[in-house]
UniProtKB/Swiss-Prot annotation:
Chain's gene name: MCP
GO cellular component labels: viral capsid
Function per UniProt: Major capsid protein that self assembles to form an icosahedral capsid. Represents around 50% of the total virion protein mass.
Short name of any one Pfam family annotated for the protein: Capsid_NCLDV
Protein family: Belongs to the NCLDV major capsid protein family.
Compartment list: Virion
Source organism (scientific name): Costelytra zealandica iridescent virus (CzIV)
Description of how the protein assembles with itself and partners: Homotrimer.
Protein name: Major capsid protein
A GO term, aspect molecular function: structural molecule activity
């Protein structure tokens, strides 16, 4: 039986191989010594999470409301929305073919729009589509399960319940949504709330109503009929669902008196990210397989997100595949055999030039995110084109000023599967065996500059 062996003396052989190429790679006055660590000191601070106070409106389904951003903390680091989802019971008198479930990505789709304002100046906004794209391209696999648990992708909410069954649990289920405003991206761009005494700062929400989020299906309805059934209170539910406790939490940094004094002493410009969503437009592969959509974005665009959303069910928001989910008993197959990317290839045109000519969807869904994004989406239908070498990086690494471009348009050619599904001629059980309808969604992520001056926030470049 052999014994493993090694000795220190052999390492000196490696050291003796130092030659010209090693002179290029090692040594010199700026070389790093990996065995003598230098401590990088920070300023003295602490951080504390606090709930924000309600300002206007009622935090309920279908309502607009807002919270005030406190100036008690020095820097606002992160914010998140915490919502209690009520238990919902399907009427026991219905037939056994009925099933009730909440939409996927519930916390994304609850939000029609969220904004942050400074004296009514909207500094940033996002909607449910941006939340879908942002999480698909930035949440790493190591956090994906936890993120799904936070936003409602759990069996207790998304698996259908039969008549007499209940979604959720007694007392409701608490869900959390990290709000991806610009100040949450890095502590270096945290919002200096203590330096803004002359701004009334608010986070504003527009919530969708519960019928836009709750899905009722009846599998007794066979193609070409759609299995989706409009929900009627009194027939399907005993009462309309009502949200439980709703809170917005904020994580603040509190700094030393010396640093606080310096915060308002000089003008400060901060490079931030903003989101622009183009108006959604109908996508009809049966009548026009190569539609042209005009894009009117502005500022320095660093990344484009786009997709074709399947809107066959108005409450099935986060479906970017050719087919609808297929319900079998108490299970849902969100990517059944008929689920494919609705887009075959895409052309991006501006200044009468093909910036990208008929690039296959595999480029936008796999290759581009492989090189330029933190992660590749695990679901069908997400597309990215990044002008930045790494769009998740805060430093400028590439962009194009869409405000200086003319006649910008995108041409997403429909895939054969989209044409088949739009006509409802897919195979039985494919989710495409009844007519599917679609809309085109495109979002731009741009850089902008905010200026902190004289106790207020503004835009030096609008």
């Amino acid at each position: 039986m052999s014994m493993s062996s090694s000795n220190i003396t052999s390492g000196f052989i490696d050291i003796a191989t130092f030659d010209e190429i090693e002179k290029y790679m090692y040594g010199g006055p700026t070389a790093t010594a990996y065995f003598v660590r230098e401590i990088r000191k920070s300023t003295w601070f602490t951080q504390v999470p606090v709930p924000l106070s309600r300002n206007t409106g009622n935090a309920a389904f279908g309502q607009e409301w807002s919270v005030s951003i406190s100036r008690a903390g020095d820097y606002l680091l992160q914010t998140w929305l915490r919502v209690n989802i009520p238990q919902v019971t399907l009427n026991a008198q219905l037939g056994p073919t009925f099933g009730l479930r909440w939409t996927r990505n519930f916390m994304h789709n609850l939000i029609r729009e969220a904004t942050i304002t400074f004296n009514d100046l909207v500094a940033a906004r996002f909607d449910n589509y941006h939340l879908d794209f942002w999480s698909a391209f930035t949440v790493p696999a190591s956090k994906k399960i936890g993120y799904d648990n936070m936003i409602g992708n759990i069996s207790a909410l998304t698996n259908p319940v039969a008549p007499g069954g209940s979604l959720g649990s007694v007392g409701g289920i608490n869900l959390n949504l990290p709000l991806p405003f610009f100040f949450s991206r890095d502590t270096g761009v945290a919002l200096p709330t203590a330096a803004l005494p002359y701004n009334e700062m608010q986070i504003n929400f527009n919530f969708r109503d519960w019928p836009e989020l709750l899905i009722l299906t009846n599998t007794a309805l066979v193609p070409p009929a759609s299995p989706y059934v409009p929900i009627v209170v009194g027939t399907h539910l005993s009462a309309a669902p009502v949200l439980g406790a709703v809170q917005v939490w904020a994580n603040y940094a509190i700094v030393s008196n010396e640093e606080r004094r310096r915060m308002g002493c000089a003008i400060r410009d901060i490079l931030i990210e903003q989101v622009q969503t183009a108006p959604r437009q109908n996508y009809t592969p049966l009548t026009n397989a190569m539609p042209t959509f005009d894009i009117r974005f502005s500022h320095a665009i660093k990344a484009l997100f786009f997709s074709v959303r399947n809107k066959t069910s108005s409450a099935e928001w986060s479906n970017y595949a050719t087919s609808s989910p297929v319900v079998t008993g108490q299970l849902v197959n969100y990517e059944p055999p008929g689920a494919f990317d609705p887009i075959s290839n895409t052309t991006l045109i501006y200044e009468n030039t093909n910036r990208l000519g008929a690039m296959g969807s595999d480029y936008f869904s796999l290759i581009n995110p492989f090189y330029h994004a933190p992660t590749i989406p695990s679901s069908i239908g997400y597309h990215l084109y990044s002008y930045s070498l790494h769009f998740f990086d805060l430093d400028p690494m590439g962009s194009t000023n869409y405000g200086k471009l003319t006649n910008v348009s995108v041409v997403p050619q429909a895939s054969p599967a989209a044409v088949t599904a739009a006509g409802g001629s897919g195979a039985a059980g494919s989710g495409a065996d009844y007519a599917q309808s679609y809309e085109f969604v495109i979002i731009g992520v741009n850089n902008n500059i905010i200026r902190i001056s004289g106790g207020a926030l503004g835009f030096p470049v609008l």
